[in-house]
Design a protein with these regions (language model features):
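Generic structural signal for residues positioned in beta-strands
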Residues: 42-43, 60, 79
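Amphipathic alpha-helical interface surfaces
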Residues: 5, 23-24, 76
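Hydrophobic alpha-helical interaction segments
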Residues: 63-132
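A short, charged helix-loop
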Residues: 53-64
């Protein structure tokens, strides 16, 4: 049996004491915000940029020093942050926030609202229009 790629990635992350966050394109796809998907499993990392092949699957790690990108890494709240980071302030609008809100439970959305997000994300998330 080939190893589970996601489990191997977790072991590598733990061994190297690095944080991983799913790439924003994957996060945006999970949230139903885009149909685009990277050709390789792609993660942001606090470690070095590199590519590996694990059980025939190409995995790319892209270094980022943006600590806010790793807030709640490995959680659905972290996915929402990665998706917004990927989309950028020009594309994150009320519809995007409503889609994110529909994928998170109330506690997770509160966690997102109360986290130290970049100012443009914070404004989008706490906009009064989002409480409809």
């Amino acid at each position: 049996l080939p190893p589970n790629v996601n489990e191997v990635i977790k072991v590598i992350s733990k061994k190297n004491k690095e944080k991983l966050q799913v790439h924003g394109a994957v996060a945006a796809n999970w949230l139903g915000l885009t149909t685009q998907m990277p050709m390789k499993k792609t993660y942001y990392t606090t470690g070095i940029t590199r590519e590996l092949e694990i059980a025939g699957t190409k995995v790319k790690f892209i270094h980022s020093s943006n600590e806010k990108l790793f807030l709640f890494h490995g959680t659905e709240v972290g996915l929402a942050i990665a998706a917004m980071h990927y989309l950028g302030k020009e594309l994150v609008n009320e519809q995007v926030i409503q889609k994110i809100k529909s994928r998170l439970n109330e506690q997770q959305f509160e966690q997102l609202k109360n986290s130290p997000l970049p100012s443009w994300m914070k404004r989008a998330v706490i906009s009064e229009n989002n409480y409809a």
